[in-house]
């Protein structure tokens, strides 16, 4: 492969892969609103957010986290919409790229299991400049922190210091998290300030000449991050 001074794979190859993702129809029979794969980011991105799956509003608008959950997440991260949606700095992947539908209680169904194994590694190969990955919600955490995890989501998130500086784990920012936030004030009082400080370093940093390839990053024992 030719050497590129930036250390990044040329954009046209990445653009072809994104077009392939957006043309994916593998899960079409299972999607009540039909497929609309949503993925954002460019090879220059330094922050990677891996979350659950698009909700109905996101499916309609084509913009990830374009809903109340997104408002809460941006509040946690202290990012305005302009920065959050700057694909040159922030990449966003769901564990599934299409809206999976809703359950009988009105909540979203789990992400389709076909999506992440098929696409994530291929996409992350191009995100060689990533310095911080956020795992948002149980589906992303369970997938990327492979192997036995603690008995509860709280026991995973409370270990946030163990995952820095390359990885951070968060609950999903849906309305269901409101009670959890009340019961766990340390998250907003201790964890989020540290996360915001790390993000400020990442998003303001000058790009490296040779970013470390993803497969050489070691984030945490048993982690898929860096594979």
PLM regions and their residue ranges:
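Polybasic, lysine-rich low-complexity intrinsically disordered segments
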Residues: 216-217
């Amino acid at each position: 492969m030719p050497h590129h001074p930036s250390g990044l794979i040329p954009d046209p190859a990445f653009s072809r892969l994104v077009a392939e993702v957006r043309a994916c129809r593998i899960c079409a029979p299972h999607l009540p609103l039909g497929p609309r794969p949503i993925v954002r980011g460019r090879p220059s991105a330094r922050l990677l957010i891996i979350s659950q799956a698009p909700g109905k509003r996101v499916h309609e608008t084509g913009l990830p986290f374009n809903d109340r959950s997104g408002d809460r997440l941006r509040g946690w991260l202290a990012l305005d919409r302009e920065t959050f949606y700057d694909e040159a700095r922030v990449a966003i992947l769901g564990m599934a790229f299409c809206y999976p539908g809703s359950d009988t209680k009105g909540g979203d169904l789990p992400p389709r299991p076909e999506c992440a194994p098929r696409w994530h590694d291929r996409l992350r190969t191009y995100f060689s400049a990533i310095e911080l990955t956020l795992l948002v919600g149980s589906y992303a955490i369970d997938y990327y922190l492979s192997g036995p995890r603690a008995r509860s989501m709280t026991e995973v998130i409370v270990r946030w210091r163990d995952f820095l500086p390359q990885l951070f784990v968060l609950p999903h920012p849906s309305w269901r998290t409101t009670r959890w936030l009340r019961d766990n004030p340390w998250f907003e009082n201790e964890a989020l300030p540290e996360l915001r400080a790390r993000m400020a370093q990442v998003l303001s940093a000058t790009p490296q000449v040779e970013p470390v390839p993803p497969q050489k990053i070691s984030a945490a024992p048993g982690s898929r991050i860096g594979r």
